[in-house]
Amino acid sequence: MSDAAASRVPASGAAAGAKFWFVQLADGISRSNFATLLYSAFTAIGLLAFISVSTPYIFNVYLKIPPAEQGQIAGDLAAWNEAALLLVFGPAGILADRIGRSQVFTAGFIFMGIAYALYPFADSVIALTGYRVVYAVGVGLATAMLQTIAADYPRNASRGKATALIGTLNGLGVIVLTVGLGGLMKTIVARGQDPATAGYMVHFLVAGLCFISAAVVAAGLKKGTVVSKEQRPPLAELVRSGFAAARNPRIALAYACAFIARGDLVVIGTFVNLWGTNAGMAAGMEPAAATAQGRLLFGAATAAGLLWLPVMGYMLDKVNRVTGTLICMTLGALGFLFTGLVDDPLAKESLIFFILLGIGQISAFAGAATLIGQEAPAASRGAVVGLFNFSGAVGILFCTAIGGRLFDNVGPHAVFEMVGSLTVLVVLFAVWVRWKAPGSTTTGGGFMGRRAS
């Protein structure tokens, strides 16, 4: 894929081949466009991940659900979430290719804000599920656009470094917004408010941040579509293009990676938080304090991935993309499988396994995102990335629906061992693709990256 394929319509005031720090930008992309992308990477993932802190709090404070029943309900909520995403990702990608990325991204933040404002008012699991579906529509629109724009804006030579920078902002967003806002509920309770009032206050704050972010992306992202109106494929061709692209073995591998990697953050967020929260409740902690324990485990995994990501981004620009993906998915498999060694998640000696989990998760994400970013054609990139996200949603739907029952009936570690075992299958597929269809080396050069033809 040529650099020009990343963006064919120059933006007003954008210098050809502009550079943002160490990232070379595609033609027509301004520094302010890329800065807005980084802002959205910080807020979108951080705000969507807050649901993993919010849901156990809703269970314990508002709905009074017994801990023994929470795993299955959490898994069912995540499954409904992913079922809604399955219906959103495809149309989101097609809309992005037809009307533009910024409009779709803006709508995603608005839906997320509405859902968070409603979430603490749920008076039953059914109502909570309905609000979760509204949230899922917003997440589907926002994450589809984040992934698509992340493929649009950098030149191919900087794609790995851009993925690392965007992933770093993702991780910072999770730590600052999810961990910080989750801790705010405990702080408010400590200052004399009851837990229910604290929950309302923080959820309204999160909703407000979603609406502010909608305004920022509407103003700051590049307007219009990636190709001119004359170059746009017909709508029917766009719909078919995501499936047709899978004839490229590297895109097929990216879709398989998405089945695991695209949803790792959701799987980790749902079950690491729940594991830590339930362990805290079993130790006699109050709901806010127990939620904080789950949040700390999630934060440790996220922080580890954040520190590891620059290393992974540098490596991905030095090796063949398929080789890089193979390395990343291997780390992902190891990270998930090693959680089987955890007995007490709150014990100090268990922390290393959550650190490895975070490294594995972020590696799988970076490898999959870099590969699809290189291989997706410019004219139908939204549709191809939409199917990439669709594959991720199918994976999350499978893992969370089965995982919730494994969590309750086998043990918390079983969820992660299942994901790790599935990741091993993707690793084997990556070995086959590296052998049969490795594609060209990256433009960054380096070890293990010679052109294979």
Which residue stretches match the model-derived regions?
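Helix-to-loop junctions at the C-terminal end of transmembrane segments
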Residues: 88-100, 308-321, 407
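Glycine-rich segments within core transmembrane alpha-helices of 12-TM secondary carriers
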Residues: 164-186, 389-399
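Juxtamembrane intracellular "pre-TM" segments in multi-pass secondary transporters
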Residues: 3-34, 223-256, 447-453
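C-terminal ends and interior cores of transmembrane alpha-helices
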Residues: 110-123, 330-344
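Cytoplasmic membrane-interface "Motif A"-like loop-to-helix N-cap segments
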Residues: 98-109, 318-329
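Intracellular juxtamembrane helix-capping segments at the cytosolic ends
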Residues: 141-155, 363-376
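Pair of pore-lining "gating" transmembrane helices in MFS-fold secondary transporters
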Residues: 24-61, 249-268, 355
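Central cavity-lining transmembrane alpha-helices of secondary-active solute carriers
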Residues: 75-93, 299-311
